[in-house]
């Protein structure tokens, strides 16, 4: 059995030799063939999860394929500083020591973060190595390294100067724990809440309007109530005033089409400082904007006696007070969608705050270029999602209230001058004063990672890292990147932002091809979660099975546009495949001690020519599938060639022609090159075993040339296909009369194409040996009193003379009776309306499928009985 412990040793040898670097395959590189793929930089706090494993596996398959195909390859690795996540980790660590970050101050806290990063961050890099991926590790980047800090400042200043980055008071998404969030950092979830109907009395009147709201704690910030202009019920109240309960402040009744007449009573409160839609209404009607709580969600002086309470805690107390004063008409159960912080799961508040924004106009050029087809999406339907999101793009809030991250390079002088600068200024450019300070906020993490496709190639780095981790010609050679592979879930977080940030600078889309894979789920299609107990940890899978087995399993399941349904059964299936090709090596080495490279021999064996023809078909299909990112089809093609064509038939047929083994071994070695991008370690191991070499003292298979397709004579495939069909058909006929593994005296073959028998005669030894027949005769007529097996191109006859059929007939009748009982039982269940209505859908489907299978089995047994009875 294959020893998976070799994987670490093999990886280390290849990394030390520099095979993963740009010129690691120098000896086979072809002119003007460049390939670049960017690793989505995982969080420095992260560990390898199954989604990473899928992304990195698919990226590495393409990287290894292109490297072996003569391309100069850059697989760019990196880590993301992960602002909020990293700051939270270090803050919690300090709190265990009784230290708050505020006690340290910003500068010392950031030093602590860097210490943590060097000691504990980046564990995921070692886990990537165990997966066998081959990025150019010497070029490892970190989104806070000095070169990328320079690039971020350059990008910011250029956008600032173009007025594409602006600062202003906006209604934003605000997390009371993590600060400002962009729209896509808010996750909306179904919420079981309440709808409060509150009486707002008209000024100087006993009449009142009933206002329906889900947020009674914000009513101190109401600056109007509104009705729909076409709602006749309330037309007479428009422009009058109502009195706010408790505070007794008078506010106006306005008419606005934003109101849904059917919602609640048709009268809604307007709180412009605490609701996205009300914010727009406030602008339209020139209303006051009154914030009723601070950045931590604590109610302020506008809330009178409730000042100092936390917003959600205050709700019940405010409602209780309103009830005691008779202002609550009724409270209803109400389901709605509420936004939560994607990071800490805190309820997000619409909040007016002065923040930095990237204007949506930045995206226009990238939208136009995508429309021209300059980037292709795989699967193609993702272009529709991309276009829809870009069409509705809003200004992007990029400032974050953190200490860890890229501090915004904007400076404020006491003379009121504001300016952006790539380099730390010594004096104010307007008044020459030294009394200025830098903006305290940092940039959204996605701003720096949005530059990844070009900043890692040296753009904006100034001279930091030049000729060590990037070179002057990198942008020319590798931009646009050839391919991006990532999960569809970060299309808008990351991919779209790289598209518009890079295009705005370089006026070219950053990627030629974009492959978006689906989610990895369990075999039932459920998301993996600890609560369901269905999480497959790639680190554990690698320990139990091997990196190769995990990689090949993921590739087999990676169908474009479909979720990957991963299970231990699938991993076991690939383990069996691994054992199959390992045993093929054992068989070959039983017959020969060493095998030549295929290019150094001439094929003489007809069997070897046939297997070589099948191999060439495999080469063609694998290349075509990889070129179109159909990873599952490429993996399936390899699986079928090794399992069916080579192991099941090549090896079996070679037992009738031992002289073919030497040539088959050379073909097997060449096929291992085809497999190498998917299963780099076992292919390396088997290749050296068959070559009688060791990786320690020989070049790796990973820098050998990837097999190229060569057209073959189809006639040899036709002949051997008929031989195999004959063997299978004879075996099937023998099994019907319980002679499965016994040698029989004679079998008759009737070919549909009568001319073919003359060509087949030269290969009769294969049929005689593998079908276990002493003699084969060709027939042009059907034989009476014979068992018959009909297949696509031929019929097989075995005479029934001297064969006792009574036991066989009894066995088949018993099988038939048993299947009929099972079929009757399932039919009854599926005819029962109560069962169909109450049973889980998947159970009903399973029963329908089982019934279909029973019908097929019954039909087959009936045909067998009919044949045996004549």
From Swiss-Prot:
It comes from Campylobacter jejuni subsp. jejuni serotype O:2 (strain ATCC 700819 / NCTC 11168). ValRS has two distinct active sites: one for aminoacylation and one for editing. The misactivated threonine is translocated from the active site to the editing site. The C-terminal coiled-coil domain is crucial for aminoacylation activity. This is Valine--tRNA ligase. One of its GO terms (biological process) is valyl-tRNA aminoacylation. It catalyses: tRNA(Val) + L-valine + ATP = L-valyl-tRNA(Val) + AMP + diphosphate. It comes from the Bacteria. HAMAP family: Val_tRNA_synth_type1 (MF_02004). Catalyzes the attachment of valine to tRNA(Val). As ValRS can inadvertently accommodate and process structurally similar amino acids such as threonine, to avoid such errors, it has a 'posttransfer' editing activity that hydrolyzes mischarged Thr-tRNA(Val) in a tRNA-dependent manner. GO terms for molecular function: aminoacyl-tRNA deacylase activity; ATP binding; valine-tRNA ligase activity. Monomer. It is found in: Cytoplasm. Keywords: Aminoacyl-tRNA synthetase, ATP-binding, Coiled coil, Cytoplasm, Ligase, Nucleotide-binding, Protein biosynthesis. Its EC number is 6.1.1.9.
């Amino acid at each position: 059995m294959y020893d998976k412990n070799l994987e670490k040793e093999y990886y280390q040898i290849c990394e030390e030799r520099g095979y993963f670097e740009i010129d690691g395959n120098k000896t086979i590189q072809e002119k003007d063939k460049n390939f670049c793929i960017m690793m989505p930089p995982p969080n420095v706090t992260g560990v390898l999860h199954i989604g990473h494993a899928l992304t990195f596996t698919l990226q590495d398959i393409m990287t290894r394929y292109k490297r072996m195909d003569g391309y100069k390859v850059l697989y760019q690795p990196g880590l993301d500083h992960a602002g909020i996540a990293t700051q939270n980790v270090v803050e919690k660590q300090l709190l265990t020591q009784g230290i708050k970050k505020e006690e340290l101050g910003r500068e010392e806290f950031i030093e602590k973060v860097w210490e943590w990063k060097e000691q504990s961050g980046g564990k995921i890099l070692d886990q990537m190595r165990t997966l066998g991926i081959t990025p150019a590790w010497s070029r490892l980047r970190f989104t806070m390294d000095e070169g990328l800090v320079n690039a971020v400042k350059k990008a910011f200043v250029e956008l600032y100067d173009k007025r594409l980055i602006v600062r202003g008071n906006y209604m934003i998404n605000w997390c009371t724990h993590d600060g400002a969030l962009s729209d896509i950092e808010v996750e909306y979830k179904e919420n079981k809440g309440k709808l409060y109907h509150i009486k707002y009395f008209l000024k100087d009147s006993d009449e009142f309007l009933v206002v329906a709201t889900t947020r009674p704690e914000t009513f101190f910030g109401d600056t109007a109530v509104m009705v729909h202009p076409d709602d006749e019920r309330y037309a007479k109240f428009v422009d009058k005033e109502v009195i706010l309960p408790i505070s007794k402040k008078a506010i106006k009744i306005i008419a606005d089409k934003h109101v849904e007449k059917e919602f609640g009573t048709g009268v809604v409160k307007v709180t412009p400082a605490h609701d996205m839609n009300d914010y727009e209404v406030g602008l339209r009607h020139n209303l006051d904007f009154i914030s009723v709580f601070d950045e931590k969600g604590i109610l302020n002086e506008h809330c009178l006696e409730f000042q100092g309470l936390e917003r959600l805690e205050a709700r019940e107390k405010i409602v209780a007070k309103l009830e005691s004063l008779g202002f609550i008409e009724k409270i209803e159960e109400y389901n709605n969608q509420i936004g939560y912080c994607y990071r800490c799961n805190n309820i997000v508040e619409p909040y007016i705050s002065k923040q930095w924004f990237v204007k949506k106009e930045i995206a226009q050029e990238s939208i136009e270029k995508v429309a021209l087809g300059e980037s292709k999406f795989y699967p193609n339907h993702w272009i529709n999602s991309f276009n829809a999101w870009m069409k509705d793009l809003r200004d992007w809030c990029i400032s974050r209230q953190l200490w860890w991250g890229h501090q915004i390079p904007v400076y404020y002088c006491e003379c009121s001058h504001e300016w952006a600068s790539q380099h730390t200024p010594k004096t104010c450019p307007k008044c020459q004063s030294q009394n200025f300070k830098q903006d305290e906020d940092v940039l959204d993490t996605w701003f720096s990672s949005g530059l990844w496709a070009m900043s890692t190639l040296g753009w904006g780095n100034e001279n930091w890292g030049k000729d060590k981790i990037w070179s002057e010609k990198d942008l020319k050679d590798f931009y646009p990147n050839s391919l991006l592979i990532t999960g569809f879930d970060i299309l808008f977080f990351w991919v779209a932002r790289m598209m518009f940030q890079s295009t705005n600078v370089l006026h070219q889309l950053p990627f030629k091809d974009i492959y978006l894979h689906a989610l990895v789920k369990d075999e039932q299609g459920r998301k993996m979660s600890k609560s369901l107990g269905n999480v497959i940890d790639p680190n554990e899978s690698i320990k139990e099975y091997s990196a190769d087995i995990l990689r090949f399993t993921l590739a087999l399941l990676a169908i474009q546009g479909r979720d990957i349904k991963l299970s231990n059964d699938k991993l076991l299936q690939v383990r069996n495949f691994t054992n199959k090709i390992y045993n093929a090596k054992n068989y070959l080495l039983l017959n020969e001690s060493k095998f030549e490279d295929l290019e150094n021999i001439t094929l003489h064996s007809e069997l070897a020519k046939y297997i070589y023809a099948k191999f060439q078909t495999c080469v063609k299909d694998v290349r075509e599938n990889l070129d179109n990112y159909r990873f599952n089809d490429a993996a399936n093609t390899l699986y079928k060639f090794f399992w069916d064509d080579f192991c099941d038939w090549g090896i079996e047929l070679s037992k009738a022609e031992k002289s073919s083994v030497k040539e088959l071994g050379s073909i097997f070695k060449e096929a291992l090159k085809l497999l190498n991008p998917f299963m780099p370690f076992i292919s390396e191991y088997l290749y050296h075993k068959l070559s009688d070499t060791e990786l320690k003292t020989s070049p790796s298979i990973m820098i050998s040339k990837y097999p190229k397709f060569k057209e073959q004579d189809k006639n040899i495939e036709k002949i051997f296909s008929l031989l195999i069909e004959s063997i299978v058909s004879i075996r099937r006929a023998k099994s019907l009369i319980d002679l499965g593994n016994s040698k029989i005296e004679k079998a008759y073959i009737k070919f549909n194409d009568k001319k073919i028998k003359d060509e087949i005669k030269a290969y009769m030894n294969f049929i005689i040996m593998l079908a276990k027949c002493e003699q084969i005769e060709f027939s042009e007529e059907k034989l009476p009193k014979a068992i018959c097996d009909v297949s696509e191109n031929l019929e097989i006859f075995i005479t029934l003379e001297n064969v006792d059929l009574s036991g066989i007939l009894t066995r088949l009748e018993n099988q038939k009776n048993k299947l009929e009982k099972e079929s009757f039982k399932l039919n009854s269940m599926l005819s029962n309306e109560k069962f169909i209505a109450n049973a889980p859908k998947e159970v009903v489907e399973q029963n329908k499928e089982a019934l279909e299978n029973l019908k097929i089995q019954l039909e087959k047994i009936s045909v067998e009985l009919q044949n045996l009875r004549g």
